């Protein structure tokens, strides 16, 4: 028996008379004569037309109405078809009016009672009155975008989950990287009617200005805010005042606690990312250092000792965690692994890789085998040679952005849906092209809107320190390539198979080519991102499962579907990290924006050497641009850090917080949305000790007495272990863009 799926998702029996009545109304509207035989014939032709769209004895109302339009036109009743289209449009407008007129009662109650998936859309938003205010304003703003700004095709594609337009709840750009050099030269302020601070003359002042700057900018943007060369730019302040290590650590501590204080909408801490050079970059080495807005009589290359002090202080504070041993969420640090990275057994190396082994805090930028250079973070607005057919890579890390660049918005394409509705590979690429066109157009519209608002003063500090969105990308991403391959009848295998991997490469290259087309068409920068998809993977899968009950999703739990992020492997595929890296290395290099390999670990690594060896092995033998080690750990309010996934404290029996990376940052698993929690349960963590690497061997760290001593001192607040760095078991766990506000452009 044939059934109809209505727009509200309900299923009702098919009724041919309803088609007849609708056609009769269209004839009547244009005073066109008709007979019962004509109506019967047209109605039967409609049923024949939509027959191939029937899935499991169910067809949607939209598919039937589309078929009516086609049949009327093909039968020569063009005027009647126009009347029918107008009839549909009028009813659609009525529905949109109802959806636009928000039900304030449900909007508030859904948040208070946590009835809506959007309450946990972002795991950084605390359930609070601030979160309620953000939820309410976000609902209004999202409706404004979909009803007043975007055209019907774009709004429909989002509402029907063909695509996901990110950050609809905010009338702002997505993410931005800022020039720390500019802040150091010019100070904080310059906005009429607002307090202005002179350039910082001391490290403590600069740390306060950075906290305030990031907090201000976070309120003008939806996503991450970033500084590059954090250690390089701060080092001269240490040198000028001849600061002691204790004084440096106090300053860095105030910065870290400052950026972790909830100070933005939704009772959130500013989403901050910093890039640390570790080694003075070549493009900065010979430049005069700047302190207090003035050039000093020494260069950045002369501040190596002070740079090491900044790095040591930062890492020690991150290792110590807060008063309860909880790891700091921000800033997310990205370290540059270059060919001249010093892998020797230094104090800072031991600290860096202990932090990596314990909390999984840092990201690593691979500048050894990837096609990036450390100076790329500063090259966007000053040295950008852009062939409009060339796709430029967005620098700055997974969440970060290079100086004076970023992204104005992100649209993610639902790949499993395309594969499911396509009968052939050709159909797949036609539908992908259509949705990419819709996505690109939506991003152009957004760029025009927020540029107008920038010029009108809605983002005063962005206007002051950036001035233009000309160097910001329009970002298109994808989700669920693994499930797309499973749903595609011409592939029918997941990402662990060669056929799926080759098809994915074909898809990514196709998308890259289309982005080049958009750059030529619109004159803007476009990039391809492996979308983090914190809530998108759940929202799209949930929508698809309701509409297409037999579509293949990632979850083994029928009531909690989700899609695998971007083109990642199934989360339960393997415990061998090198097997996963071998596959992902060929795919992640095809993205031109945020993409990362997460080495999920069940608990902390045995030693800092184990972390260092793994980081080095990946950098020297793989091309993927960004990666991170992600151990799971737990926090007890009474007893602090606990290794691995422990929901109750083994000492006091109280409930704990279990921390893991939800997409790119650590949050308590209890705060995740249902889809990501299902993913966490199905994750297979990597077993480094038993992973088989078949490439060349790199020199590995060995443990010595000095290392033992240093690591013990570093972990003095933790339970004492016989040898923290060695003992197994105990410690497991040609177009030139310039920007008038950029200090580099002014040089």
Where do the protein language model's features map onto the residues?
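Cys/His-rich microdomains that often coordinate metals
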Residues: 640-644, 653-656, 729-736, 746-747
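Conserved catalytic cores of very large enzyme subunits
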Residues: 90-94, 100-470, 491, 497-651, ...
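Acidic, low-complexity intrinsically disordered tails
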Residues: 685-722, 736-739, 747
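Charged, amphipathic alpha-helical regulatory modules used
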Residues: 1-106, 468, 684
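Long insertion/accessory domains within large nucleic-acid-processing enzymes
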Residues: 647, 653-700
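Core structural elements
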Residues: 67-72, 277-278, 460-484
């Amino acid at each position: 028996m044939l059934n109809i799926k209505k727009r509200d998702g309900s299923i009702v029996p098919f009724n041919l008379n309803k088609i007849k009545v609708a056609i009769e109304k269209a004839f009547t509207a244009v005073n066109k004569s008709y007979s019962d035989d004509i109506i019967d014939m047209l109605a039967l032709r409609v049923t024949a037309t939509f027959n191939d769209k029937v899935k499991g004895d169910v067809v949607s109302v939209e598919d039937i109405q589309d078929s009516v339009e086609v049949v009327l036109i093909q039968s020569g009743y063009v005027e009647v078809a126009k009347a029918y289209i107008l009839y549909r449009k009028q009813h659609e407008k009525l529905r949109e009016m109802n959806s636009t007129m928000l039900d304030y009662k449900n909007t508030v109650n859904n948040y208070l009672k946590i009835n809506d998936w959007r309450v946990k859309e972002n795991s950084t938003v605390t359930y609070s009155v601030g979160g309620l205010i953000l939820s309410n304003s976000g609902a209004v703003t999202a409706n404004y975008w979909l009803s007043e700004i975007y055209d019907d095709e774009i709004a429909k594609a989002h509402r029907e989950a063909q695509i996901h337009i990110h950050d609809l709840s905010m009338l702002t750009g997505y993410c931005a990287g800022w020039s720390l050099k500019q802040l150091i030269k010019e100070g904080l302020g310059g906005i009429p009617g607002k307090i202005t601070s002179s350039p910082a003359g001391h490290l403590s002042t600069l740390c306060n200005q950075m906290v305030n700057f990031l907090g201000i900018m976070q309120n003008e943007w939806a996503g991450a805010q970033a500084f590059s060369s954090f250690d390089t730019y701060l080092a001269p302040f240490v040198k000028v005042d001849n600061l002691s290590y204790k004084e440096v650590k106090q300053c860095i501590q105030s910065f870290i606690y400052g950026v972790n204080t909830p100070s933005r909408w939704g009772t959130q801490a500013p989403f901050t990312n910093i890039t640390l050079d570790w080694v003075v970059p070549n493009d900065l080495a010979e430049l005069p250092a700047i302190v207090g807005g003035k050039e000093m009589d020494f260069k950045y290359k002369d501040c190596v000792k002070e740079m090491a002090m900044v790095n040591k202080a930062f890492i020690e504070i991150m290792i110590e965690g807060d008063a309860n041993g909880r790891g700091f969420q921000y800033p997310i640090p990205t370290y540059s692994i270059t060919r001249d990275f010093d892998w020797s057994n230094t104090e800072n190396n031991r600290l860096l890789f202990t932090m990596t082994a314990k909390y999984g805090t840092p990201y690593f930028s691979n500048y050894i085998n990837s096609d990036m250079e450390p100076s790329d973070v500063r090259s966007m607005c000053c040295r950008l040679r852009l062939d409009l057919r060339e796709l430029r890579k967005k620098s700055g890390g997974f969440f970060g952005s290079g100086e004076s660049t970023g992204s104005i918005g992100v649209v993610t394409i639902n790949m499993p849906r395309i594969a499911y509705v396509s009968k052939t590979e050709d159909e797949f690429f036609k539908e992908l092209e259509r949705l990419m066109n819709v996505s690109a157009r939506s991003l152009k519209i957004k760029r025009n809107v927020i540029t107008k608002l920038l010029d009108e003063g809605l983002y005063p500090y962005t206007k002051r320190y950036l001035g233009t969105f000309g160097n910001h990308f329009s970002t298109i991403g994808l989700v669920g390539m693994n499930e797309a391959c499973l749903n595609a009848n011409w592939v029918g295998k997941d990402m662990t198979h060669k056929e799926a991997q080759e098809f994915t490469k074909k898809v990514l290259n196709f998308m890259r080519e289309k982005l080049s087309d958009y750059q030529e068409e619109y004159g803007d920068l476009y990039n391809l991102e492996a979308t983090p998809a914190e809530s998108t993977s759940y929202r799209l899968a949930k929508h698809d499962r309701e509409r297409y009950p037999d579509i293949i999703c990632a979850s083994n739990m029928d009531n909690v579907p989700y899609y695998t992020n971007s083109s990642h492997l199934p989360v339960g595929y393997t415990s061998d990290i090198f097997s996963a890296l071998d596959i992902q290395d060929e795919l992640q290099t095809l993205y031109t924006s945020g993409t990362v390999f997460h080495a999920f670990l069940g608990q902390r690594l045995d030693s800092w050497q184990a972390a260092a060896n793994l980081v080095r092995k990946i950098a020297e033998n793989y091309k993927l641009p960004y990666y991170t080690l992600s151990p799971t750990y737990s926090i007890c309010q009474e007893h602090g850090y606990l290794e691995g996934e422990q929901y109750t404290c083994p000492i006091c029996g109280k409930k704990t917080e279990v921390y893991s990376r939800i997409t790119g940052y650590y949050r308590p698993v209890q705060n995740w949305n249902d889809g990501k929690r299902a993913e966490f349960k199905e994750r297979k963590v990597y077993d480094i000790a038993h992973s088989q690497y078949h490439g060349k061997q790199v020199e590995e760290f060995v443990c010595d007495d000095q290392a033992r001593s240093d690591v013990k001192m570093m972990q003095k607040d933790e339970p004492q272990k016989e040898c923290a760095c060695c003992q197994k078991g105990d410690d497991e766990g040609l177009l030139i863009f310039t920007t008038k506000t950029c200090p580099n452009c002014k040089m």
